[in-house]
Amino acid sequence: MLIGSHVSPTDPLAAAEAEGADVVQIFLGNPQSWKAPKPRDDAAALKAATLPIYVHAPYLINLASANNRVRIPSRKILQETCAAAADIGAAAVIVHGGHVADDNDIDKGFQRWRKALDRLETEVPVYLENTAGGDHAMARRFDTIARLWDVIGDTGIGFCLDTCHTWAAGEALTDAVDRIKAITGRIDLVHCNDSRDEAGSGRDRHANLGSGQIDPDLLVAAVKAAGAPVICETADQGRKDDIAFLRERTGS
């Protein structure tokens, strides 16, 4: 099992070595900006490296939105992110599910997701990540994910399970992996994060493993059950220990 972390994009290879990571995740630009990622001077070196690199798409992306001023730029920046990810030989691009304005728009939100994926041209796989909060989110509640997957599941999209988001959404971690696999047939990546807040809070505040509200045994069990590469999106201080903890507990 590959275990690693979300690191600074400045020098992912050096960061991986410093943290003892088998795999890393990076942003290719400002995650709060609509600006396209800039070409990287080290693109060839990253592409040639044996280290798997995942790319997290900008947080602003909302493919489900009815607002053209959000949805159209979302499609554009996802396309640009996928192209930039291909330039560095990335393993996949991870994108959040987004949301709609009210319950009456949820089914249309699913269809907007479908249109976005049908129009997307990418050499790199795209993974949908479950999210922590939002009353009208596409990927917070597992029952909503199931409805979304009925619409987009045959596009080849993958799935990234975030443990903190699952906890914050009020979904039980004890059988989360089994339930998601029953919906999607796959888990391609795990974001293994503790949570600073109580279950069902809707708050996306990560904590280092063992320092938050989630029983570390639950995190280990989820990672083992998923059987996918793992990224710790935790604070710099303590993240190396998070990797070592998971490696020891999973025998990886």
From Swiss-Prot:
Pfam families found in the cross-reference section:
AP_endonuc_2
Q: Which domain of life is it from?
A: Bacteria
What the entry lists under InterPro entries is as follows: AP_endonuc_2, AP_endonuc_F2_Zn_BS, Xyl_isomerase-like_sf, Xyl_isomerase-like_TIM-brl
Cofactor binding note: Binds 3 Zn(2+) ions.
The reply on keyword Transferase is no
- Report the catalytic activity: Endonucleolytic cleavage to 5'-phosphooligonucleotide end-products
- What is the protein named? Probable endonuclease 4
Record the organism.
Answer: Mycobacterium tuberculosis (strain ATCC 25618 / H37Rv)
Q: What is the lineage of its organism?
A: Bacteria, Bacillati, Actinomycetota, Actinomycetes, Mycobacteriales
